[in-house]
């Protein structure tokens, strides 16, 4: 039996997934050694391994890239997930607010901030990429970066002041720099 993974993305993101003359779709298929079938009517994407590809992780990674594009990331940002050390995390605001469109819009506004300032600050302080699209908040980056970005987003969702979140991000940034410096000094030669 052939392994396959199906996922669904919004129809308005199909064009971004396929790309100009199929370039994005081709790049994903080549990077993960998979075949991708796109149903542009329903938004269903089917991923199958190419013959000889026995790596089940490749299907899961390809699914993450497709999901990232579906969550509003530009393909170039989604391609960050080609790196095994990068992860995608998605916060679904419907899980917190149900179908209350006003609450979802309010929280999206808090996370984006005035002229995108808050989203930009979270991205700069964590080195994660953030997409606020539909009823979701998507985050791409290293595990620690995405974890910190998620924590900052959750603080904003709970109603914390922006200044409190910025302070939290500065502290986390300082801790990350200190950790990186210590790791550089502790690495054994060779």
Please provide the spans of the model-predicted regions.
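RNA-contacting regions in translation and RNA-metabolism proteins
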Residues: 1-190
